[in-house]
Amino acid sequence: VLFRSVVWAGGTHRRTDGQVQRYAPQDVRFEVLRQWRSPHSGASYPVAMAVVLGKAADTMRLELKPLMDDQELDARASTGNYYWEGAVRSSAANATDASRKLLQGRGYLELTGYWRAQKL
């Protein structure tokens, strides 16, 4: 589970052996790979991204790519906003050791606050 907001970033990773790795804000970096502009709201979402986790000696790079771009929800009647949530494909590798096995997976990505500033 990873989170990023204007003021905070961090996350946890549960390994296959059950151990939990916690990531402090300085250990999580998000890189936009591709933007998608909604024809419905006009909002631009970073639907494809790389998440770099960890310190230099043991860094994991996780790439997230949507199964389809248009997964925007019109939630103006409930939350007052449009937001993007949907299915993604993932691939992960050790960023400092290319010989390590590439991992493939599926996931869920939620992107809020891209249509207009949210009132908290």
Where on the chain are the PLM-derived regions?
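Structured soluble/peripheral alpha/beta segments that form catalytic or ligand/cofactor-binding pockets
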Residues: 1-120
